[in-house]
Amino acid sequence: MVRDVGVTEMNRVLRRACAPLLAAIACSLATPVLAQNDKMTPIAIPAQPDAIELGTGPLPGATAPEVWHKQYGSVFARNVTVATLTPFLPDPAKATGAAVIVAPGGGFMTLSMENEGWDVAKALAAKGVAAFVIKYRLRPTPPDMAAFQQSMAQMFAGAARPPAGKPVDMTASLAPQIADARAAFALIRRRAAEWHVDPDRIGMVGFSAGAGLTMATTLKGEDAKPAFIGIIYGSLAPVTVPADAPPLFVALAADDPLFGNSGYGLIDSWRAAKRPAEFHLFEQGGHGFGMYPKETTSTGWFDEFVRWISMHGMLKRLH
């Protein structure tokens, strides 16, 4: 059983482990990084009729209500205290049996639900892959938008990057989120027949902080056991690779302000462990490109990811 850590302790560890993510998010509040409107605009919580509660309970100590906003042509959730999983299922005639849990990013303070969640899931479903967007629990933030921006500035102030070249273990700070991911894998396996999913072909792809959760689930998720993983503009810090580590797909832009100049220790770790790894370093794309239409080759990550999981035999039809 994964143990929930206290919110105060979780915040303290996150300040250290996620400093680059937090800094970039805070900077994005002042500097437009995309052509879309960078202003945060509060919106009503969208209807999510297909969302399934994961049963991991409310986040301990969290009292702020869940709130959503628009920014950069996408929608974002904050103060998520109850984790959910939303299925995006392919036409049964096209179903391959493969499934992917999609973990949006946002520095563990927000979730980019559209650009790094729903849009990814819809594209996967169109390829015959059952996709499931996980809305995992987040670090509490002030409901008020101005107070939220101020809290982020305080959050990353003075935080340092981890030493380069040394294995990083941020999993201790992510116990609630790892529990959410484990519950997502368990739910899909329980309902595999209903959803036309092969229980042995369930993978996970994550973006930025969601990539961090994907890696943490791979390393510390115990019974989660993803069949394959995608790390999309996530940290490439070296890790201790399990002997049974799944095939790894990585996509990153060389001009990513967070991780573009931090080395490729994760790739080296996987190769040293003699586990399958594929790495796409795009010349341009920045951070957070997701499914946004851009003039850079980084938009090709999705097609490459689908070809890669097909190469690994994940898209063979069940029948």
Region locations from a protein language model:
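N-terminal signal peptide c-region/cleavage motif recognized by signal peptidases
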Residues: 30-31
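Short beta-strand/loop motif that positions the catalytic acidic residue
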Residues: 250-252
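Bacterial N-terminal signal peptides that target proteins for export
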Residues: 7-21
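Acidic catalytic loop of the alpha/beta-hydrolase fold
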Residues: 255-260
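C-terminal catalytic histidine-bearing segment of alpha/beta-hydrolase fold enzymes
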Residues: 276-319
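Serine-hydrolase catalytic machinery in alpha/beta-hydrolase-like enzymes
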Residues: 51, 58-84, 91-100, 105-195, ...
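Primarily recognizes the serine-hydrolase "nucleophile elbow" in alpha/beta-hydrolase
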Residues: 175-245
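Alpha/beta-hydrolase
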Residues: 103, 232, 282-285
